[in-house]
């Protein structure tokens, strides 16, 4: 009948020695064939038109090891950055542009949400119909199934995040959104993260590690 199955392997089998010819695994090539130049151009156009861009980083940026390209991209766009739980580590958490994890109401003021390798889970969007309702959405993702899955996008680029960011960086001039960045900084000053510094706790430990 259906149920748990235990496979018991004897010690003489697990400790046995044998000869074999190892196979050297082939390197996995990044998916670049799916990246269309017209999609890159459309993304660049949207970025240039934006006045209040916001970059949302997901696990795809971590998997593609896109940290360097992401940092350069964010500086060129001149935008604040947030991330998902899976996207943590792709962007420096001590950088002044970093605003923490994306919340359900944290994207209400941006006019362009640039999504790098994130999948719009319900813990991010809440009510998807009301998510980032004042913004156009530009999504970069390697998985076609994630495009327009939970949230409709205005434009997207399908492919490896590292390669997408590299190509856009090559075409994008430095943008100036100093007023927008000052506005974001004012929020960080008005609503700082507070925690008890007299006892050992997670945020304090991470702060010391960053230092």
What are the language-model segments listed below?
Residues 35, 48-113, 211:
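Anionic-ligand anchoring segments at beta-strand to alpha-helix junctions in alpha/beta enzyme folds, i.e.
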Residues 183-211:
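Active-site diphosphate/adenylate-binding microenvironment
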Residues 9-14, 59-61, 144:
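Glycine-rich beta-alpha junction loops
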